[in-house]
Amino acid sequence: MEKLETAAQSITWHVTSARWQVAREVAAVEYLMATLGSDRFLPPIGGWSVDYSVVAAVLDGALARGGPVHSLELGSGAGTPWFASVAKLTGGQHVAVEHNPVFVARTMALLEHYELLDFCTVVEAELTPGADGAEWYALAPITSRVSDGSVDVLVIDGPPASVGPQARRPALALLERLLADDALVVLDDVVRAEEQQTLAAWEQEYGDRLRVLPILDRAALFRLRSAAPSEGPQSGDEPDPTEEA
């Protein structure tokens, strides 16, 4: 009897959660349609790609920031035209990073179809082993197109989990210098244990500089403040003043 009650409670929780998820997505779609004002049928998203609520939160943050908003997306797909549309609305630019040549071609085809190529660049960056042996995007193709301190919004939806444990954890350490102060960051798929561990590790590493915004459920949304000058440069960033010229 106790097992049946537990099972019933679990089913009730999942049904309630699903109903709230549907309600959130409907509200997000209504906001996007009213605010983006697009007369095109952009590709449906959700499932493997980001949810509508993620794009809505990015759009809301972009409008609150004001001015041209430049965004960087790790992992391209159906969500890319949506982020490119946000960039178009604000007068900014979107850059999508993709390691798979097949998906690069598909994303480019989507952007061409929706006439968004002027507002989005797709960067092909292969996955290469780092010092710890874990694979991550080659940095050179990214940094050659994105300047330091220019990224207002970072969407982390890659590399895929199949790459290895906590595949997305290197993102902040490797890309922090590209971020503008108080940049908006999205970590997708936090329903998975590995992304939860990644977020927890970032919260510990960045402390008060990282402020989570409790708006989304399947993704984490937070702001990352730049390091204060008083915190000093990282080792090796500046020459030793005692060293002779």
What are the language-model segments listed below?
Residues E126-S144:
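Adenosine-cofactor binding site in Rossmann-like domains, unifying the SAM/SAH pocket
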Residues A105-T107, D132-G133, F222:
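Short, charged, surface-exposed secondary-structure boundary motifs
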Residues G47-T128:
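SAM cofactor-binding core of SAM-dependent methyltransferases
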Residues P159-A245:
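C-terminal substrate-binding/active-site "lid" region of AdoMet-derived donor-dependent transferases
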Residues G46-V50, E73, P129-E135, P160-P165:
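Short, flexible loop segments at the rims of nucleotide/cofactor-binding pockets, characterized by
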Residues R145-V153:
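A short acidic, Gly/Pro-enriched loop at the edge of an enzyme's catalytic core
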Residues M1-S53, A62:
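Rossmann-like AdoMet
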Residues L72, V153-V155, V186:
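Structural motif
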